[in-house]
Each structure stands twice: as C-alpha cells, then as structure tokens.
C-alpha cells in the first residue's frame, strides 16, 4: 500500500527476475547480465555501426586529467561507446556532465590531498554524438520542448541491448 492509501500499480523490475514475452518465454534484459560481459559483447556488435569510430586525435589523448597516459587498448573508443550506451540505458535521461563524472577518477596531486575530477567531456560528447548519428540515442526534451533533459536510448538500442544480453545469458548457462 502506498502512502496515499491505495495499492500501487507500478511494477518495478527486480534484478534477477526475468520478464516474459508474448509467447510466455523468459526474456533476458540488459539489467539481468553482468555489465562487464555485456559491454564486451556489445563492443563486438559496435563493428556493425560505421558511425562509431575513433577520430584521428583519439590515439594521443588521455581519458581525463586524472590519467597519466592514453589508453593502451586498440579498441578503447568502441568499448567506451558500448559502456556509455549501457549507462544511458540505465540512468537516462542523462547529460554529458553526469556521464563525464561517471568516467572520472582521483587525481594524484603530489603531497596535496587527492581530488576527484571528471573524465574528458570532449570524449563523452563525441561518443554521444556518434551514438545519436547511429540511431542508438536521442535527446529528450521537457514537455514544452524548451529544455533538454538529456539523452535516452531509442527502441532500436533497447532491442540491441536485450538481444546482446540474451546471447550473454545463454553463453553463461
């Protein structure tokens, strides 16, 4: 019973509880599988999207001021894009600054106390623009259309995430 005295009809998805499709079969959601395995499998699917590719400057940049060196992995851009798509799906509508904070870290300032810093907003913005061009995310506006609330995933991205999660879940069993 809610605080207003009537039963709530809102159904909350509980982690580990699978949904059923129209035929009564169990469906696996992207929330049901391990994030690490989902991002790795989703990274492999990112090859199908031509718009998601690292710019030429991506080999020389750090991912934030808290890093000492650029990423070592060859496919770090696609991995970050897959991870960012998952984060937009879970936390959306979400903006560039909040995503950059999620990819931030602790900056070593020598003898001074460490300090929390955000990740690169430029990398975050460019990846979100590429996800928009690929049709995986879109901007959500408020009811009057005057203010941007952040990015959300499209139905195509939702089905992609659930399809990849189904593959990951079947590989685990």
What residues fall within each predicted segment?
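Short amphipathic alpha-helical elements of helix-turn-helix/winged-helix folds
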Residues: 83-91, 102, 160
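Long, low-complexity, charged/polar intrinsically disordered regions in eukaryotic proteins
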Residues: 4-82, 86
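Short basic-aromatic helix/loop recognition motifs at nucleic-acid
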Residues: 72, 86-92, 115-119
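Short acidic, hydrophobic short linear motifs in intrinsically disordered regions
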Residues: 93-115
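A short, conserved structural fragment
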Residues: 132-145
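Basic amphipathic alpha-helical segments that dock to polyanions
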Residues: 99, 124-134
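Major-groove recognition helix of helix-turn-helix-like DNA-binding domains
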Residues: 112-128
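Short, amphipathic alpha-helical interaction segments positioned at domain boundaries
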Residues: 148-173
């Amino acid at each position: 019973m809610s605080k207003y005295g009537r039963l709530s009809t809102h159904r909350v998805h509980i982690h580990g509880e699978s949904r059923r499709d129209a035929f009564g079969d169990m469906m696996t959601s992207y929330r049901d599988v391990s994030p690490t395995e989902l991002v790795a499998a989703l990274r492999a699917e990112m090859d199908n999207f031509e718009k998601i590719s690292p710019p030429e400057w991506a080999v020389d940049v750090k991912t934030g001021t808290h890093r000492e060196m650029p990423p070592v992995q060859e496919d770090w851009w696609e991995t970050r894009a897959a991870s960012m798509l998952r984060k937009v799906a879970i936390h959306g509508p979400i903006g560039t600054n909040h995503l950059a904070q999620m990819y931030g870290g602790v900056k070593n300032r020598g003898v001074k106390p460490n300090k929390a810093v955000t990740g690169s907003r430029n990398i975050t913005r460019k990846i979100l623009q590429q996800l928009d061009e690929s049709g995986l995310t879109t901007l959500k506006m408020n009811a009057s259309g005057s203010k941007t609330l952040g990015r959300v995933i499209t139905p195509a991205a939702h089905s992609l995430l659930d399809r990849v999660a189904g593959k990951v879940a079947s590989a685990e069993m």
